[in-house]
A protein has these predicted regions:
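A cytosolic-side transmembrane-helix exit/cap motif
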Residues: 66-77, 94-100, 120-131
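Hydrophobic alpha-helical transmembrane segments in multi-pass integral membrane proteins
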Residues: 86-96, 154-161
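Juxtamembrane membrane-interface segments at transmembrane alpha-helix termini
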Residues: 61-70, 86-93, 113-117
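Membrane-water interface of alpha-helical transmembrane segments
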Residues: 18-25, 41, 45-48, 97-104, ...
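Transmembrane helix-loop-helix
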Residues: 26-70, 149-177
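C-terminal membrane-associated helical module and adjoining short loops/tails
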Residues: 103-177
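Interhelical loop and helix-boundary elements at the membrane-water interface
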Residues: 13-25, 61-80, 133-145
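Single conserved hydrophobic/aromatic residue that forms the stacking wall/gate
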Residues: 1-5, 9
């Protein structure tokens, strides 16, 4: 199905035809090269590798394949959106440690209960587009149950930084509110 067929996508420059695929690829390549060069210059190779993984995972694996292949698309694809705390941490510390990984987990678990209400609200647009979002593939009732499950897991994961001794009482109180 053409992305231009849906209200969700028709205003995007590629779908509307305002930008050609070749021009988009050239512009993306320039930004990728410049951004990667700056990332490496101002931080380190570990940060560049994690950032590159996130870029490839989102732009190729999620956007081209997962989005169209599985109702778990935003769950799996949410990994790339959860990486910024790890990227920021490695830019400063040049190491991977438990605290930023718990933050990645928190954002990862936050994504489904955050996004699925939008998918429910726009279910007709996703149906028209042929995107197998959870509410379409498994039904709205099942999606709501999974949202609650993810919210419970999210609450538990939000306590992890305190329970592992990575943060103090202020974090625990603010997280529990």
């Amino acid at each position: 199905t053409s992305s231009a067929a849906s209200d969700v996508y028709k205003r995007q420059p590629l779908a509307s035809g305002n930008i050609t695929l070749l021009n988009a690829l050239i512009f993306t390549s320039i930004l990728l090269f410049l951004g990667s060069s700056l990332m490496l210059y101002f931080s380190n190779i570990l940060t560049l590798l994690i950032t590159t993984f996130g870029f490839i995972f989102y732009s190729l694996i999620y956007t081209i394949y997962l989005k169209w292949a599985t109702p778990q698309n935003i769950v799996i694809g949410g990994l790339s959106g959860a990486l910024p705390p790890l990227i920021g941490w490695t830019a400063v510390a040049n190491e991977i440690s438990l605290l930023p990984l718990t933050l990645v987990l928190i954002i990862f678990l936050w994504t489904p209960p955050h996004f699925w209400p939008l998918a429910i609200d726009r279910i007709d647009e996703y149906k028209k587009e042929g995107v197998p979002m959870m509410p379409i593939a498994k039904g709205v009732a099942r999606t709501k149950i999974e949202m609650v499950i993810y919210a419970v897991l999210l609450f538990g994961a939000s306590l992890a930084p305190f329970l592992y001794g990575l943060t103090g009482i202020f974090y625990l109180v603010s997280t529990s509110l």
